[in-house]
Amino acid sequence: MFLRLIDDNGIVLNSILWLLVMIFFFVLAMTFIKLIQLCFTCHYFFSRTLYQPVYKIFLAYQDYMQIAPVPAEVLNV
């Protein structure tokens, strides 16, 4: 009975603890969502700045290194 103004049977403390738990899970969910958004942003950035130019260079190299097929006259020896 020390420092008790109302006999609430712990409902205020229980409500405060549940509120803290809900805030913790809310912050955790927001962090997870922001992490996923960061992954999509990084993927978009690298796709535009790294993957597409490297792929274009690879296609140019592949076109440059293309070997012409052997003519049919050479095979009829």
From Swiss-Prot:
Protein name: Envelope small membrane protein
Entry keywords, A to Z: Apoptosis, Host Golgi apparatus, Host membrane, Membrane, Transmembrane, Transmembrane helix
Quaternary assembly: Homopentamer. Interacts with membrane protein M in the budding compartment of the host cell, which is located between endoplasmic reticulum and the Golgi complex. Interacts with Nucleoprotein.
Subcellular location: Host Golgi apparatus membrane
Membrane-spanning ranges: 16-36
Single biological process term from Gene Ontology: disruption of cellular anatomical structure in another organism
Virion surface side: 1-15
Alphabetical list of InterPro entries matching this protein: E_protein_aCoV, E_protein_CoV
Organism of derivation: Human coronavirus NL63 (HCoV-NL63)
Intravirion compartment residues: 37-77
Mode of membrane association: Single-pass type III membrane protein
Claim: tRNA processing is one of the keywords in the record: no
Physiological role: Plays a central role in virus morphogenesis and assembly. Acts as a viroporin and self-assembles in host membranes forming pentameric protein-lipid pores that allow ion transport. Also plays a role in the induction of apoptosis.
One GO cellular component term: membrane
PROSITE patterns recorded: COV_E
